[in-house]
Amino acid sequence: MTILNHTLGFPRVGLRRELKKAQESYWAGNSTREELLAVGRELRARHWDQQKQAGIDLLPVGDFAWYDHVLTTSLLLGNVPARHQNKDGSVDIDTLFRIGRGRAPTGEPAAAAEMTKWFNTNYHYMVPEFVKGQQFKLTWTQLLEEVDEALALGHKVKPVLLGPVTYLWLGKVKGEQFDRLSLLNDILPVYQQVLAELAKRGIEWVQIDEPALVLELPQAWLDAYKPAYDALQGQVKLLLTTYFEGVTPNLDTITALPVQGLHVDLVHGKDDVAELHKRLPSDWLLSAGLINGRNVWRADLTEKYAQIKDIVGKRDLWVASSCSLLHSPIDLSVETRLDAEVKSWFAFALQKCHELALLRDVLNSGDTAALAEWSAPIQARRHSTRVHNPAVEKRLAAITAQDSQRTNVYEVRAEAQRARFKLPAWPTTTIGSFPQTTEIRTLRLDFKKGNLDANNYRTGIAEHIKQAIVEQERLGLDVLVHGEAERNDMVEYFGEHLDGFVFTQNGWVQSYGSRCVKPPIVIGDVSRPAPITVEWAKYAQSLTDKPVKGMLTGPVTILCWSFPREDVSRETIAKQIALALRDEVADLEAAGIGIIQIDEPALREGLPLRRSDWDAYLQWGVEAFRINAAVAKDDTQIHTHMCYCEFNDIMDSIAALDADVITIETSRSDMELLESFEEFDYPNEIGPGVYDIHSPNVPSVEWIEALLKKAAKRIPAERLWVNPDCGLKTRGWPETRAALANMVQAAQNLRRG
């Protein structure tokens, strides 16, 4: 029984973000479709070769996506919303981009599909839309073409396919309501057709991803798995693949399925290997997800070996990444600025492939000498002074309940804030960032590279802040922002100014479509050596009589959007960050900033996948926010912002944040999210987003007015704010001006009644 290794997927974007650049060039009309497709082919070939050279036995094919892999699956199944369909029913790459970006075939605006987080990661997918009586057919053969590509290059491949039950689970019904699970029998023939095509190509194993199996699914959904997989059996061997949590609670359902193997995440799940071995059919292959695909830390291979060694030789066994390596940066070797000590603690996607090769070799040979050598830096890290700060640990231990309480309740604070700011009805504001123009990016890059001195850099940033204030005053906005010209990323910027973080040069991971992020890495205890945002907030406020918001990223979001330490709890990291940012709130307030926004877009996405684990997470997540904010005086207005959230199941916790104003993303869901706030009778103020910033479309005054009137039927108008869905960093100035002008006009029309 020779043990093989494999990955569940590999980063798509390229070491230098080649995919992003090719996509954006194509969207801008600066390159042809064939040039775009050629970049995809080159990246796939390179990534397969890199994995093979690193010692991977079975290469994933079908993990590449032009926007996201769920949208790819929608096209595979012929599931294209009517507003994006070509007249002749054909599907091409432009169809895919229209769904993601919001366009009709005519080029006219057409609402993009809703976007949400992929389970509890920082990756996004376009939510499949289902209508009653929907038809499915194989229309997009990208997977088959890529398998042909890989086979032509001589690779041993394992196609990757999102499973039918998870696909339906991830979608939403549009129009007349019905049970989307009833579509299962309609999509299975397409899956059968795809598997038959793969069998024709001589494929032995197909990785069929069913991550929904780690959730606490309703019984009807669990019951759907058996008939679904009965229909799919027989053409190729199926590796039923789960990740992000353990499978033990649903193991009875899983072991009844006619598949030939099971992949389990042994990093994030609590599954016991011996128990799995005992309960799985003896002829099943077990794929052990031992190497963390979601973090950047070097694996303790001695520990991983001990976890799996007792079942070696007792059943067919593969070793694998816990999930797709999509969530990890590509290659540590190109990071030239990390010092040797810190660098020795990390492993990116390619290094994780090396770890899998090393682990496979040791499991096959029984010679464990190489494991101790690989794991040595991990032992050293446990005692490093760069990891432990006694002052931070002491301050954290001294926190009391009083530290998370504002002085007075919202009603008292609201009165003080109304007296201070005297804002009109339907007050208008934006979420924080303004367009990051080429000039701004060049300015920051030149400064970072040392081509620009600090004085000239500061002069340049000040000019862009001044321009943002002038633009907002010209538009007639009521509460202004400084525009965040100095910030490359809402998390990275804070991480750069906090002790306990390090940064990479090329540690990019895909967020959605062409958007990539470069998450900071928490390597040690977190503290704030000096004020971070005060200088620029104070400068912006000096340029106007209108209030300017101080802008902070909240502790839970900084945690969720960073690569966290693995040696302490997430709660500990969040509260350390909260204490650091608490000092920032106090300093902003002392500098005369009266409105401070603490963004927590990641609060909901940080939820554990199993509802039974939610309460503990929400308790410390809310406490971290309150520790951050509670230092503010009554007449300081605390705002928070949240993105793409389903709120109804966490409304108690949203209210418990006790923010004076919450702004939320609602335009893509047509204000549906406000139902949660209405039913809960949310007591504080709300800014429902009135247009989608992820699309270049400019909303009309009438459209915005209609949304606000809809909102006012649910929330009293005196508690409503008017704002876009999210920050405007990724938009251009022309559409930003046009959209905000219409937004302000809509608010003014409503004030006039």
UniProtKB/Swiss-Prot annotation:
Binding site for L-methionine: I431, G432, S433, E484, D599
Any one GO molecular function term: zinc ion binding
Record keywords, A-Z: Amino-acid biosynthesis, Metal-binding, Methionine biosynthesis, Methyltransferase, Repeat, Transferase, Zinc
EC number, as in UniProt: 2.1.1.14
List of residues binding 5-methyltetrahydropteroyltri-L-glutamate: R17, E18, L19, K20, K117, R515, C516, W561, E605
UniProt-annotated binding residues for Zn(2+): H641, C643, E665, C726
Function according to Swiss-Prot or TrEMBL: Catalyzes the transfer of a methyl group from 5-methyltetrahydrofolate to homocysteine resulting in methionine formation.
HAMAP family membership: Meth_synth (MF_00172)
NCBIfam families: met_syn_B12ind (TIGR01371), PRK05222.1 (NF003556)
Name of the molecule in the record: 5-methyltetrahydropteroyltriglutamate--homocysteine methyltransferase
